[in-house]
């Protein structure tokens, strides 16, 4: 139906927007303290960007992208994630030109064709950061801490942080061979997707939700046994930095990310009560992505957090902010002359920083008082024929059930001072 939003999308109505803006305020405040600048990229990109960046053969590229041809027969895709877009912007706009570390953050909609359920929508929102140009393990730790601080700044508790290293091009082939040797015996019992992954990307077998409970999965080789000395040292230093910062974590040698570009550090923060959708943030290092997209070799690390899941976690812990009242002041005008006199007062109040509302339909006193109550306004200003003749207005304190008369000449000044107390 034309009056229904497409499946997997959702309207965010005024009574819910306050929670979103609260989360976004925390994000912007935190990123300012960490020194990250906001970037806004297009919602669609050339399809090849994601094919090369995320990787052919990944579930995202093969099954989940919204891809279409425009009128110029160019293949375009609604962004399924934003790291590839951020790297493209980094290259196109020569953000690397000063040779320094670039620290970026974003908030925006992403799109994946998936089975809609709580915490998993076809249009969903992410907050993420990308730090490009530095390979220090301290930067990995900073990014992990930023993700963790974001969630705890919202008041969330009961979070788990899992950590792993997925190696580098020097040591990952060894692990790939060990995985293929191990899973060869179980190949007939793997799901169809994992049978395909066995040849193309056996690491992603470890990320399979369907085969996760198979008893043989627990015996799969751990990548930590295959890391080269450089990756081992890097991973140990990341852990040392996190320990020094007082953040608890759990090593998970089978934690891999579902995108091909990750190298070395991989992490995931979960809120277990959300069940199957418990992962609220995750990321890692992607030292080869900039080069893969046409740039010079550039180390980089980042993460993304799913805001729908974050809001679900906040709701479960009763941490959603209270909806503020719609108005501070409600003007009640009785009669046409009073309505004409009230309108410029309404504008003056708003210009003075007061949230002010007024009924334009000429309803009765009783009906307008009901509107004032529904708006949550602390004060109702009543202007009728008698008040207009005396050049005054009645100011009713809705909380104290008290009222006083105020001269119109001083009304705006009085209300501004009362509201700002």
What are these regions (language model features)?
Residues 1-421:
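TRNA-recognition modules of translation machinery and tRNA-sensing kinases, especially anticodon-binding
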